[in-house]
Each structure stands twice: as structure tokens, then as C-alpha cells.
Amino acid sequence: MADKITTASAAWLTDPTVFAVNRTPAHSNHVTFSHIPEIGEPSDLKQSLDGEWRVEMVQASDIDLEEEPFAAEDFDDSAFGRIDVPSHLQNAGYMNHKYVNIQYPWDGHENPQEPNVPETNHVALYRRTFTVAERLDAARQNGGTVSITFHGMATAIYVWVNGMFVGYGEDGYTPNEFDITEALHDGENVVAVACYEYASASWLEDQDYWRLHGLFRSVELAAQPHVHIEDMKVEADWNPETATGSLDALLAVRNAKNAATVSATLKDLSGNVMWETALAASDETGIVSGSLDVKPWSAESPALYELQVVVIGHDGAIVETATQRVGFRRFRIEDGIMKLNGKRVVFKGADRHEFDAKRGRAITRQDMIDDITFCKRHNINAIRTSHYPNQEYWYDLCDEYGIYLIDETNLETHGSWCLPGDVVTEDSAVPGSKPQWEDACVDRVNSMMKRDYNHASVVIWSLGNESYAGDVFRAMSVHVHELDPNRPVHYEGVTHNRKYDDVTDIESRMYAHADEIEEYLKSDPKKPYISCEYMHAMGNSVGNMDEYVALERYPQYQGGFIWDFIDQAILVRLPDGDERLCYGGDFGDRPSDYEFAGDGIVFADRTPSPKAQDVKQLYANVRIVPGETGVEIANDNLFVSTADYVFVTRVLADGEPVWQAEQRFDVPAGETKHFDIEWPLEAYRGQANELTLEVSQRLAAAEEWASKGYELSFGQTVVAGSKPVAASETKPVDGIVTVGRWNAGVQGSGREILLSRTQGGIVSYTLDGREFVLRRPTLTTFRALTDNDRGAGHGYDRAQWVGAGRYAKCVNNTIEQVNDDTLKAVYEYELATPQRTHVTITYVADTTGKLHLSVDYPGETQEAPTIPAFGLEWTLPVEYSNLRFYGPGPDETYADRKHAKLGIWNTNAYDDHAPYLMPQETGNHEDVRWAEITDDAGHGMRVSRHGESAFALSLQPYSAFMLEEAQHQDELPAPKHMFLRVLAAQMGVGGDDSWMSPVHPQYHIPADKPLHLDVDIELI
């Protein structure tokens, strides 16, 4: 080992060739003990330094690293502030939050010139005291060593112990470990850390994320006995032809000459011994098992075992035990297809940043458990660790729960090579082909691989994200293949320079449209395909996802990763006591990309967004198609049959469950079968307008991530009943129809309807004195722009529709008494558009108190942009906030996002308002048959389809224009009314991306086609 450097240097901060000083070589994250542990026991050779530290913020220009007094053991830090570790300086109030996507955060304040760092460079001076725990100190006293490890920091650290400089480190997403044995003394010790905001490493860490700093993962001490297993490289292979496993491990043993033997034992997690051996200790100790009778690992059935290696001294005593959990599996590319244990795999994935609204990247174990629970519950089988190695515990969870991982190097340099308008500047790309960056980049991927190599869940190594291409990536790829000849290499950046196609084993693209992907798949490609990012889930998004899922019919299409998992918004308490989820720019940070980090399928508080409803159904491994003779079940799982699931079969009569049974259907993995079901259709056909045949796949037993009976997938088919949509009722004899000079009205059954000749529609609708018309319902042709709408220029393209309905004028009306019981009013409106299209609103009221409402748009003969939405908006008193409806649900649906379950659902306007980071269109329900809008006493309004055509509906505490004006959810006013929108149609939400791609044409509303809204309304 080279002599240690004992003096810190500021020059390292701007030298790309210096990225680690005195750092311990990267190694596996196996767990060590001073004894033979029980399964799952924590290490007794580690000591946490998490907790309260002291901290002071200074500028880099104020520090002399060679003679820095704050590092001295006797330095008086009583004036320092306090901070918890792990945490971020920004979240603790010591630095300002900044969010940018592509650009470097100092761009414009200074001209970014690599490898230089900004003149304004914050430094956090951390200090804390510690006493080495007895077990660790015993190892030190007996010839062993003690190290300190920083598991996560940003961006560069200098470390001193008791005034002695012990090391410098960059790449804060893999361990920075330093040997501190010589610096320790008995009793209380002091560790001091200078944590820099910027270093040359900042050029490699331009991830689309909040720019957060500090010691954000755990800090710990670890003892290494005088004979120590430094590294374990374990190959746990599974041979699908023989259905057996094999173990091949290489151990790096320090001071092996001081040990006699190394014994290895493989156990299942119940402690049963599967295999064991013993051999003489050597510096490189190889362990080979031969064939093993073990279960294979997969996301579907994540069987794990524990390899336990014990070092025995010459005196027969245990020197050290090392444990490593392993899963036996084989992941290879064969014939251009990625296969797990011999079977083609499809990644049903998401890209996941580590994030918590209060803690930033300093997420807790419970956060990770919540995330993986969400994944399993929503049929997500793969995660890309975008764009850096994650906390080590996440990999343990993925091994245990069953998640495939693309493990991604901490590398993104988007701002170095991309100008506005996606203009590529190859010469400025970092690292590109610049030799001064090569060692740092190779070191980053090496550190990740060494740490995570033994995890069964890691199936692909990724070289980084959005960093263009170049010889440096070729060097990284070569290194990965040398270290691991089995797992494939992933890198999307070569799409910008195909000269470097050899860098990646996988054709990976971002935001390629389904038709573009299909074109590749039809070209007889040599490489398998994945979308490392697709379905940009910003705000109200994830439309037309089914077009991508349909590509699974091509063998070389192997899935994609939704961008992304969680909204990244910082929870802040405002001066008035309210809380706000803040996004870029809210902290005065400039430049900023504002709300562009709000892309999650879960909200920042980890509650599922409505988008997750479609993701769960479309990602399901079991596809179910009921029919009148039974059900067809396709099992897309690779290894597990459906025998261990329960299938609940139901018949719904107009949404109401009338029959249910529980059955078992055994479909082997990869097969499709039909099962007969004796649906009691004839018993209920005459009682309903439509019958829904439903089959639901549910857990037969509880899992770690869900309780027994949890639904994973469903299938529904609607068949016709023989009952008409609405049976006519007998007219009451005491009804009154009045045609006045200014108004006309109908009274009957305690209800009164008043239609105005001057106001352009209904002006009163009462039941027992309760008024349901605050103002005449207005035409609506607008929706609050979604993030995708804004990105695609929807506001500009369809600006004419913003006020077309709102400001339409009534140009004609006719009111007539049809008969003794019925009144008809027809209002002709001219839309406020250049085309001046005429729309007809017709009310037919009778003495039962019912109202038949129809709205007709004839289709425009002149050229006009497609229509965002078309129907009526009805303003109701605020107490009418409850919504019960029959249609797909329970969450919101749109024309291109409605893989929901048909049924009768109960919600309310507040819960139905999805709190997207930027307020926007929300709460729509497609294909509604009827809906009831009521107060808590059950009084209200029922809206039903008239005839066979369903409608779209939403009930919100805010109007579209309120949503359009607000920048944050807390800016929306306290609700004073409810806004009921009854629509003939609303356009889809899109999802290909949020900056360029419009909603697909089939989900638009053409202006030249007629639209017809036809509903019955009654008060209840």
C-alpha cells in the first residue's frame, strides 16, 4: 500500500485526477462479526456515528486546509450550530435549496468551465466526539484496524481525526472509507469533516434533482480483526437445464498467514445447512461448491440463502465471521434477448430517486420499506437506481422482496454538452474522450460494482445517465466486463453518438414513442431493447401507456422504466402556519427548472397518485378476460403458477354485486388457459341494463407487502341486460306547468324548476326549499392545463377554447309547454371563437321534478384546433361535496388512461382532487352511467345517462380557472362552492413526455365532429 498522504490540499478540488486520497479500496458490503452469528444478527464490529454533530458554514475562500484550526482536537466548537447526521444542510436551514434539471446551478452567475468550481463555494465544517466501542477497540488492541465510513455525502469531504488528516473523498454515493487506526487514542476522540458544496466532482453530478449537500447517509466506525476478509466476490449461479445451483466465491483475506483455515457454510434463512466446506486460508481463497439443491431467485420467488465464512486462527479460535446473503440466478443475454434463469424477462419498471419531502435524500429504512411495498402492490418488478447507487439497505430489500435492479453509476453531465433546444456540443462534453476524467469515472463504476456485486437483485450495470458518449465510457464498459463477465452493461447516452454503440449491451432509449420502438424491433436488431425512461409522469399524465405494454409481443422488447417514482417537492411551513410542497424557484433559487421535479407516480408524501391505478393494471403479470362461458387467464409470470392465488368471481348488475364465488385456477407460468364458469346470467339479466362479469386475482395468503385477499389484477367484461336504461315513471296529478313572460316553470313532487328567457338557461332547481342553482350552468370548452399540456404548447394551440364556452352568448331561445306535464326550453349559444359556432342547450322538465338536459355541438366547418373539453359546468352550494358514481374507478380516469374497475364508487370532491404539484386538471371520470352529488344528509342531485351513451363527470371544490391561476395547492382559495362538470368528452392527458409530445390524435376531440351530451337530472 502506498504511503498515506498526511496533508490536505485545496488543489484537489479542481483536479479531476484526484478523487480519493487515503481511501480504502472498494469492496463488497458483506457483514462481519467477531463470532458466529444468528441469521439476521447485526454486526458487533460496527459503531454508528449518526446523531447530533456540530456544524459551521463558511466559504471555501476562508479556509486554509493545510493549517485548518477547526480540525484540531482541542478546537472550541461551542459556537457551532447543531445538525443531525444523516441529513442535508439545506433541510436543516444552513443552505438554500436549489433545483435545476440540465443546467449547472451556477450557470449565468458564472460561466461554467470544467473542471473549475464556482467562486461562491459553501463549506460545512462538521465535528463530533466519540469513544470507540469496546468490541471495536479490542480488535484494534489485538493488531486489527478501525475505519470510518461515510456512506453518503455531497460533494467532497476532507476528514481529520484528533487533528490528523486521514483522507479526502468524492463520489458521495458509494462508501468513502478511511483507516483511522493511527489517529485514535484511548477515551474520547474527535472527528472533523470539511464538506464542500462544489468540487470537480460537481461536473459529474448534474442529476435532474434538488442540489442537496452534507452528510446525508450514515457515518460509522468498523473494526477489522488482524485477519480480515476484505472482499467477497460471490457467483451464485443457477443452471436452468439441471435445475441446480452452484457457488463460486473468491475471498480477499488480509494477513491470511496468521489464520489456519477458512470454513464456508451455506444456510437457508431458517438456519438449515445446505452445504459446507473448509480449506486452508490464503490471501485469495477460492470456494467452489459444485451442484447444489437450492431454489432459484427471481422477483416472483425471491429465494435467499446466507453464505457464512469463518476465519479460524492457528489457536483454533474464531478470528472473524463474514456473512453474505445470496440468491441463485443466471442473468444473460442469449440470442439478443435478456434471460433470467433461461426465460425472457420483461421489466415493468420505474426510475427511483431517493427522496423524502422532509429529509431529501436522507431517507429512512421505513421510507424504503414503504417504497418497495408500493412496488410489489402495483406489480412493479424493476427499479433503476436513477442516477446513483442507492443506500445499501435498499439492495437488501430488493433481494428479499424480489425487485430487479439496474444499478446506476453516480454520473450525469447533461449540462456540459446540451444547450437549450437539445443542441449537442460534443467538444464540451464531460467526460467525453478526455483522459483527465477517465480514472474518476472508472473508479465510480468500480466502487458501485464492488459494493453491490453479490446482490441477486442487481441484474444490469448502468454507466450513468445523460452524459453523452466518448472513450471514457468505452473504458468504463471494458472495466465492467472485466470485473463481471455475466451481467450486461447499460448506457443510453450512445444514442447521441452511434460510434460508441459497443459501449452498451442493450439498446436503451429515453422517451421513444411506441411506433419508434416498434420500428427498431422490426429491424432484426442484435440487441435487446428497454426504455430506461418512458411515460413521463409529470402531474396528470401516464396516458396511452397501453401502447407500450402492447410491444411485449416482440421478444426483444424487454420493458421500460416510468419516469419517475416519487414527486420531489420539499415540505415547508409557511409564515401563516400552512404547509407547502415547494418546488424549484420557491426558495429564490435561480436559475431553476421550477416544478419539473414533480414526476412521480406517488406524491411527495408517498401517497399513491391516480396514475398508479393504470400502472398497476397494465403491469400485472396475470391477464384476465372473462366471457359468458368462463374466463381466459394468461399467466405472464416466468416461474410461478397461479395455483397459489385466489380468484374471486363476481357478477355486477348495473354496478351492484349480486353474485360472488371464490375459485382456484391453476395456470402454469407462461401459459394461457380457459376455465368454465357457470355465471348466473339469466337470473339477473332481466334486472339490469348491463351485467359485469368480473374475475379478480388476489393473494391467498399474506405477504410481507400485503395482507391476504389483496387484489393484484382483475378482468371485466360487460354483457347486455334486458332492462332499459331508465324506466318511465307515472306523472303526478298535482303538477303545475307555468309559462310566464320572463320565466317558465314546473312544480311537482316537492320540486320546482325555473327556466329563464333572459339568463340563457335554468336559474332555479329546488327540492323542499334547497336550491341547487347558484348561477346558470355555463358551457365549458376548457380544462386547466396539465403539465403535459403546457409542455406541448397546448395553451397556445387551443387558446380560443379558454373562453369559448365561458363567454358564449345566448343568441336565441324558445320555451314551450309540450303538454300538461312537460316544459321544453331550447337555448342557442354562439361560442366566443372566430368561427362563432352555434351550440344548442335543451332542457326538458316535467312534473316529476326530473330534468332532461342535452347539449349539442354541430361540428365546425371551418378549421379550428381540437377541443380540450366540452359540456356544462354547474356551480353548487359547498355542502354538496359527496360523490357516488357508477363507472370506472375509484380514481380519476381519462380517455387515454382508464384501465380502472367498473363499479359503484364513493368519494368526495376533496379526496377526488389529486394534489398535483402544480394545480391542474384533475378528478375526471370517464364512461359514467350515473352519479349522485349529495351533502352529508344524503340530499342532492342525481345525473344519469339518457340512452346508451355514457358521459364524463367531475366534482371539484375549484373551478378550472381557479386551478389554472394557482401555482401551488395552498394558493387555491378556501372552497365556497362545488363545481360539477358534466361532459360529452374530454381529451386525454398524454404521457410520452412533458415537453414536446402532444396527446395522441385518437384521444383528441376534433372540432369538425359533432358532440352530444345527453343526461337526466333529478334531485334526491
Language model features with spans:
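Extended substrate-binding grooves/exosites of carbohydrate-active enzymes
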Residues: A2-E41, M164, W203, I318-E632, ...
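Accessory carbohydrate-binding/adhesion or oligomerization-edge regions at the termini
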Residues: A2-P105, A194, V549, I562-I570, ...
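Accessory beta-strand-rich segments of carbohydrate-active enzymes
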Residues: D3-T24, N29-V31, I39-G40, R54-V58, ...
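Beta-strand/loop-rich accessory regions of lumenal/periplasmic or secreted enzymes
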Residues: N91, E197, S298, W679-A688, ...
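An acidic-aromatic loop/edge-strand motif
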Residues: N96, N101, P105, E110-N116, ...
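Beta-strand-rich binding/interaction modules
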Residues: V159-V161, T244-A280, V631-Q663, F675-D676, ...
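Extended acidic/polar, glycine-enriched regions
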Residues: H185-E188, L250-E334, Q687, L691-P732
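Catalytic cores of secreted or luminal carbohydrate-active enzymes
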Residues: E205-I229, G577-P626, E632, D636-E656, ...
